[in-house]
């Protein structure tokens, strides 16, 4: 048998891992062929001329670095054939397994998300978010066990059949790695000039790692931005000026490079003072998880999806332009009750307002309300006289998972608990505030005990994919119909107990849900109608609220309604963001008529929903309507950042 030279192992690892990662990247991101919902595609000759050499050099550096580190670790034993086995097991075996784990996570979180967005989905905890993914990837543990058995089998074969080699036959060294890294510098700079090529390269681990190192080395002023960051630092030696910098009002400096020097106008509107009449009304707030605004009035196969909400809208007030500020439950819940985009812990909230006013407060939630600090931020648990949530009834959960981020109860359990404490008019002797949370429309849109309201087969969890879009949509609308049925049962109970006419009911959603529109499933990916428009229905026909309305406006609306005051004046826009206000991936405003203007802070691309125009901010013509809209967005973003500091 011929001797196995180490460079054969390097070549094998290079080809196998690159081909495997490329297949996964293409399947997830479609960076080569393009596809549904993908606008960043490497499809031009100039892009390929940058993409291919940059990818090959970065991947070669990654494989060679693994080889050299492992060789140093083996020391004198690096000439043994066992070293080749360990090298291939590390790069091909473990490397490919980690790639699968990464793309399993991205299948849930979407590539639009960074750590801040994952933390949002995990309720503020990266650890919880990780458990959220692992909950979906139990097979990875079995794969790891299989890999260990495969390694032991290969170990036995190598020890028996493969010869060792002389160290002199191993000419590769650290100087070769240094040469590859030096070559990567101009290639990374060239990629920055081709946004689609840069996007494609950033999906590959090797290039992302090399670029991260270059970004750190050239961040001279340590402001987090450099020559190699997605948002190139225009002032590399001035830590006060960089992308996402807080623009100081009126100092003559444009710190963030958008919209010129910020001029602060329009402070936060003070919350109305609660002035209760002699006989205060009760309040019932119902939050429907992942409930789209266009569910109201929709029919599927000739059947109405929301007959109960339709009736409530006819009798009361239906605000057709209501929007979440973000696409995540935890932050939305805080905004609904705290009356701010990012309420401060211990700050004003509906729970604290009504507790101080003498209300009896009950929380009946199909979700774990401590998740992500919702309860603590708005004083939910501390204010409640009655508190029942999914964590308290974990044994009755609707799905198998017991992790905090996945807990949910069937809505009928929520009704059962409500009935235990509210059986008749005597239980409403005091002014009462009830908060009910219904989880039915959350992914995977069904559970074993969910009733059927719409015809046709519903999708199993394993069948939720773009190829089954029609079935997935039907499953979602069935869950929305079940949510509506539950709302109808709550209204019926209020009427039966004689308190409906003295109760202000508010029904809304925490965010919307994409059903493969533009290639997305779920929420939190983009700022658009499907993922951020929510229903807002008030039982009081006199409370004529004009849109657009954001979740942070609800506290003021409710306090005015309970006080008998007129609703607040209409606002000019609702601010939205992905990430956090200070470090967003995307910011946007939605103006009357459902017109979105969004700014991607990585590419500096501004998108206009009504015209379909996409252009870099600096390419917008001065004095144009598009430039004015983009500047309104930039101004509102800066204003909201300063309001959050007040």
Residue ranges and their predicted role:
Residues 1-207, 218:
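Transmembrane and membrane-interface helices of multi-pass
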Residues 195-275:
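Extracellular calcium-associated, cysteine-rich motifs in secreted modular proteins
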Residues 212, 265, 269-285, 290-458:
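Active-site-proximal alpha/beta segments of enzymes that process anionic O-linked groups
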Residues 268-275, 304, 450, 495-541, ...:
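Histidine-centered active-site microenvironments of extracellular/periplasmic hydrolases
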Residues 274, 502-503, 546-591:
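Polar, surface-exposed loop/tail segments
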Residues 319, 329-337, 393, 521-568:
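Substrate-binding rim/cap in mid-to-C-terminal beta-strand-loop elements of soluble/periplasmic
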Residues 409-426, 458-503, 561, 635-646:
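A long, amphipathic alpha-helix that forms part
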Residues 570-646:
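Phosphate/adenylate-binding glycine loop and adjacent helical scaffold
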């Amino acid at each position: 048998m011929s001797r196995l030279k180490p460079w054969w192992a390097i070549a094998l690892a290079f080809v196998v891992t690159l081909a495997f990662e490329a297949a996964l990247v293409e399947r997830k991101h479609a960076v080569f062929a393009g596809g549904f919902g993908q606008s960043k595609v490497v499809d031009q000759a100039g892009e390929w001329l940058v993409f291919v050499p940059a990818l090959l050099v970065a991947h070669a550096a990654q494989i060679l670095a693994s080889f050299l580190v492992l060789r140093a670790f083996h020391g004198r034993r690096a000439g043994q054939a066992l070293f080749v086995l360990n090298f291939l097991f590390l790069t091909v075996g473990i490397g490919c397994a980690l790639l699968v784990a990464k793309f399993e996570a991205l299948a849930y979180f979407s590539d639009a998300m960074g750590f801040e967005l994952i933390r949002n989905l995990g309720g503020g905890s990266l650890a919880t978010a990780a458990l959220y993914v692992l909950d979906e990837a139990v097979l990875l543990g079995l794969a790891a066990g299989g890999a260990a058995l495969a390694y032991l089998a290969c170990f036995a074969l190598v020890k028996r059949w493969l010869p060792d080699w002389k160290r002199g036959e191993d000419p590769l060294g650290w100087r070769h790695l240094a040469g590859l890294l030096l070559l990567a510098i101009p290639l990374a700079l060239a990629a920055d000039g081709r946004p689609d090529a840069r996007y494609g390269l950033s999906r590959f681990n090797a290039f992302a790692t090399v670029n991260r190192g270059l970004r750190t080395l050239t961040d001279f002023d340590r402001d987090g931005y450099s020559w190699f960051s997605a948002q190139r630092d225009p002032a590399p030696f001035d830590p006060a000026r960089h992308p996402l910098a807080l623009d100081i009002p009126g100092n003559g400096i444009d710190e963030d490079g958008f919209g010129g020097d910020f001029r602060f106008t329009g402070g936060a509107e003070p919350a109305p003072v609660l002035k209760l009449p002699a006989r205060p009304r009760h309040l019932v707030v119902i939050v429907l998880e992942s409930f789209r605004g266009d569910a109201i009035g929709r029919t599927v196969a000739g059947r109405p999806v929301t007959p109960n909400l339709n009736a409530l809208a006819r009798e009361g007030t239906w605000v057709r332009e209501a929007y979440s500020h973000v696409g995540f439950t935890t932050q939305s819940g805080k905004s609904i009750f705290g009356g701010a985009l990012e309420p401060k812990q211990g700050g004003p909230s509906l729970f604290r307002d009504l507790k101080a006013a003498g209300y009896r407060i009950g929380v009946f939630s199909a979700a774990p309300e401590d998740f992500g600090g919702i309860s603590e931020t708005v004083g939910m648990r501390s204010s409640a006289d009655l508190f029942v949530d999914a964590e308290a009834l974990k044994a009755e959960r609707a799905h198998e998972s017991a992790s905090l981020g996945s807990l949910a109860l069937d809505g009928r359990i929520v009704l059962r608990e409500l009935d235990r404490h509210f059986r008749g008019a005597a239980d409403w002797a005091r002014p009462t505030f009830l908060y009910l949370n219904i989880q039915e429309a959350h992914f995977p849109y069904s559970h074993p005990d969910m009733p059927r309201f719409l015809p046709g087969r519903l999708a199993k969890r394993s069948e939720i994919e773009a190829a089954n879009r029609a079935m997935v949509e039907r499953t979602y609308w069935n869950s929305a119909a079940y949510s509506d049925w539950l709302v109808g049962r709550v209204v019926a109970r209020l009427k039966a107990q004689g308190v409906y006419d003295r109760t202000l009911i508010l029904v809304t959603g925490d965010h919307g849900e994409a059903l493969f529109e533009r290639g997305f499933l779920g929420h939190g990916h983009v700022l658009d109608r499907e993922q951020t428009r929510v229903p807002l229905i008030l039982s009081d026909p006199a409370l004529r609220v004009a849109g657009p309305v954001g979740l942070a406006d609800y506290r003021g609306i409710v306090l005015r309604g309970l006080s008998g005051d007129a609703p607040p004046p209409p606002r000019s826009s609702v601010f939205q963001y992905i990430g956090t206000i200070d470090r967003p991936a995307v910011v946007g405003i939605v103006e009357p008529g459902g017109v979105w203007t969004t700014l991607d802070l990585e590419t500096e691309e501004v998108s206009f929903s009504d015209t379909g125009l996409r252009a870099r901010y600096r390419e917008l013509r001065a004095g144009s309507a598009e430039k004015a809209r983009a500047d309104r967005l930039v101004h509102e973003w800066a204003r909201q950042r300063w309001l959050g500091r007040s």
